[in-house]
Structures are given as C-alpha cells and as structure tokens.
Swiss-Prot record:
Belongs to the bacterial ribosomal protein bS16 family. Pfam families: Ribosomal_S16. Gene3D superfamilies: 3.30.1320.10. The gene is rpsP. The keyword GTP-binding does not apply. This is Small ribosomal subunit protein bS16. Disulfide bonds: none annotated. GO terms for biological process: translation. Keywords: Ribonucleoprotein, Ribosomal protein. It comes from the Bacteria. The keyword Lipoprotein does not apply. One of its GO terms (molecular function) is structural constituent of ribosome. Coiled coil: none annotated.
Length: 81
C-alpha cells in the first residue's frame, strides 16, 4: 500500500480550503483517508497553514510520500523529510 500525504479540497466554488491528509495513493482525492494532519487556506495573505508537526514527522518516517504541493507547505512550516 503506497501512502501519500496530499490535499483534500473543501470549500465553495472559487473559494477553496484544503485539509492535509494521509491516504492510500489509489483512493479518490476527496475519498477515504487514514489520518488528517493539518489545514491550508490560501484565501488569506499570508495563507493560513496549520500542520501537526509530530504527526507529519511520524508519517514521513513511516514512508509516506508528500505530493509536490504538500512538500512546499512542509518547507513553509519548517518540517524536514
């Protein structure tokens, strides 16, 4: 089972809000997930970003692969792989 850390889109049309989730790579974007580790709201300047650093580090050490966007968000939050 390949585990990814990725974004789940919520919110309204043209007003997105995202949750950072840990999910099987084969599950749909807004489908089943294993764990929720944070939120990301790009509608503010600067953007609102909340990440549970302990949970993120735990999943990264267990082999979960972040997507490109989530990797950039981790860098913004100061979380290393």
């Amino acid at each position: 089972m390949a585990v990814k850390i990725r974004l789940k889109r919520l919110g309204e049309k043209k007003n997105p809000f995202y949750r950072i989730i840990v999910a099987d790579s084969r599950s749909p974007r807004n489908g089943r997930f294993i764990d929720e580790i944070g939120t990301y709201d790009p509608n503010y300047d600067p953007c609102k970003l909340n990440i549970d650093a302990e949970a993120a580090k735990k999943w990264l050490s267990n082999g979960a692969q972040p997507t490109e966007v989530v990797g950039k968000l981790f860098k913004m939050a100061g979380i290393e792989k």
